Amino acid sequence: MFPKRQGIIVWLHSLKHSKHLRKFGNIHYVSKRLKYAVLYCDMEQVDEMMKKLASLPFVKRVEPSYRPFLKLEFESKGEKEKNSSYPLGYSAE
């Protein structure tokens, strides 16, 4: 139903060129302090988009986002770990 999407992190020399990234995908976030932008495109097009972006003169570095490959369902702790008390560095004796 929905196409698989993947983020691409683009490190820039200057932020004034960040508007040019619109033609490569959907811009999700732009950091002014660290000078990078996160944009999303279809998962099938990630490799060719990264090559195109890396060839631009105002781009320092291009990295893929590994979020689609991370396991986001976490296991809960067992009852033994939940009920155990942790020492605070001193004894209450």
UniProtKB/Swiss-Prot annotation:
The keyword Cytoplasm applies. Its main location: cytoplasm. It comes from the Bacteria. InterPro entries: DUF2129 (IPR016979). Keywords: Cytoplasm. One of its GO terms (cellular component) is cytoplasm. Pfam families: DUF2129. It is found in: Cytoplasm. Belongs to the UPF0298 family. This is UPF0298 protein GWCH70_0997. It comes from Geobacillus sp. (strain WCH70).
